[in-house]
């Protein structure tokens, strides 16, 4: 980066600073980085402007492209970019490679995908050739990344400021940015500290109102009783494992090695193209050029193998033993589901945050559909695995699960009536995964729109494959349309069933009936967080029906008597 002696670098003028103000705020962390605070020599402020040479004014380098390089694999050369962990940390989102000691948070699935390739920068780039970070530098980065909370509420609003957009988590209590996974849920520093004080000390809080106070980012301090009640409602547990006090990254690195290595070889071609822009488009071209028959064969090949509980079952079941068996199987299936999704043609071409988000939102629907497919030839039974086959009445030992069993059996019976074929099953499973409504955001940039367009194209391809599968049965056009409609309508039933199952799992977690496994627990919390954020966004938007009612005051028109509306009853409220 050093220029030739003959070329003078342009000068940048620094703003004149009053020395008195510097002395007053010298200990503020807002002026100096944390690791240099108080360690720099005193600066003598004079009355004239200070100018420094700027190596950046004539550079045409696009710094936005650098945000996808990670500090653990880059070495920075030259004085243009200081060799400080703070500088490296600000240029690397934790979505792909979380920095050591980082207080941002990785989505439950982000670490399951392999890190994309990194390519050499152009000659004019100030960055050196990528190479592994030395151990000493990693330790320095870890120390520099640790930020102390200034107060209970002060840092919770900025806990996720370094996290990528697709990597952001919110507090389950107040919906502020979450600083980590604490006491069983994602929470900010403020709510974590409040819950800790409440369970360790005095907690005889009394609500001055009706025990229904709104707890959000701005009003979380208004009522301690309602805040503690909401902490318990979202699943905070007194007996939460002490490891949950650490950041999400620290907990994830203690997971079993085979789960961290599930990513295989597909890290997402989108992230590779961002590094240089010259990555071959072979994989994307192949995925878009597949015929319906080839696409179905690829999806069938991606199907995961059968899993076994591999535990001795004692009957009759108890609530604990059944929930332990079901959650154990679900956790094993989630591990295989990640590999399955990455083998769907075109899935790894999506933005990494979209891949993670899709899996977080549809995982229970995929599990439910798989359960129905295994049980379709066994009327009255649910085949969770070859060594765990349950009758309907065996679910009575678990509170609330009998209703879910009945709904699963009803949907399975409908699939049996339709004589569901394997090709149709795998297409429906892929359609559940590729739901584009799960990736909508309020503000979409060009990259997000590009990823969404790819997702829509993939969904069209899978839908065409499903239509082709139905058409080859020799049915008439009317029969084909009717069968397609019946199959797609069952997806809405599966979504409703998934919501019921998610609610039941959340209740089991709050009651501490059975300890959930790591991956299952993270997926459950991620889905719950997405649902709460979506419901909050919907509630903030006025309904068109309410607007119409406000624009037309007065009693609503009475029914003519021909509609199925129930008769009105006088209200005594």
UniProtKB/Swiss-Prot annotation:
Belongs to the nuclear hormone receptor family. NR3 subfamily. Transmembrane segments: none annotated. A zinc finger (NR C4-type) spans 171-191, 207-231. Residues 534-552, 559-573 have a biased composition (Low complexity). PANTHER family: KNIRPS-RELATED PROTEIN-RELATED. GO terms for molecular function: hormone binding; nuclear estrogen receptor activity; sequence-specific DNA binding; steroid binding; zinc ion binding. This is Estrogen receptor beta. SMART domains: HOLI, ZnF_C4. The gene is esr2. One of its GO terms (biological process) is cellular response to estradiol stimulus. Residues 15-170 are annotated as: Modulating. Residues 291-527 form the NR LBD domain. It comes from the Eukaryota. It comes from Anguilla japonica. GO terms for cellular component: nucleus.
